[in-house]
């Protein structure tokens, strides 16, 4: 709570995962005592885990991870639930180009989409893993008209960079 209050003058986008998200009691304490927006959800895995967050108005934004929630279909269900509570969604990214593009594709048809949470300064680092570079212009990602997510993993690159003991 002290940290969130100290950040209030800086108009941050959100205070991410301020407490373990399964502790709705602690999250409520933070929510009631700070003025910064709160974002939670990267560690929740199903739409049912988002219910208490949404019903109790414990977050200004939610950030489900498309990989950890089970894919695009579950992510879209979570987004629809959040829309009913007027809560914007910002898919979490910590897994690479497939995760970024899956989240971006899902959000292309979600009215309460805020942004795809990622480390935009490092997105081009993903290009070595894939057959087509991510189309990043400014602060936006543009989706391909190629089938699926619009990319394929560069299997030759992946094979050449296998870490001993981890497959290959």
Give a label for each model feature.
Residues 130-168:
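C-terminal extensions of enzymes
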């Amino acid at each position: 709570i002290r940290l969130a209050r100290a950040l209030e003058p800086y108009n941050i986008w959100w205070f991410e995962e301020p407490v373990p998200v399964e502790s709705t009691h602690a999250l409520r304490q933070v929510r009631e005592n700070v003025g910064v927006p709160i974002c939670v959800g990267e560690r929740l895995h199903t739409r049912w885990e988002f219910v208490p967050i949404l019903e109790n108005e414990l977050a200004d934004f939610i950030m489900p991870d498309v990989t950890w929630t089970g894919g695009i279909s579950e992510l879209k269900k979570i987004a629809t639930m959040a829309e009913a509570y007027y809560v914007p969604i910002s898919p979490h990214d910590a897994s690479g180009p497939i995760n970024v593009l899956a989240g971006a594709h899902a959000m292309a048809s979600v009215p309460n989409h805020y942004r795809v949470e990622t480390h935009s300064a490092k997105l081009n680092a993903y290009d070595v893993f894939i057959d087509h570079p991510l189309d990043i212009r400014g602060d936006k990602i543009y989706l391909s008209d190629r089938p699926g997510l619009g990319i394929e993993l560069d299997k030759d690159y992946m094979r050449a960079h296998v870490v001993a003991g981890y497959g290959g």
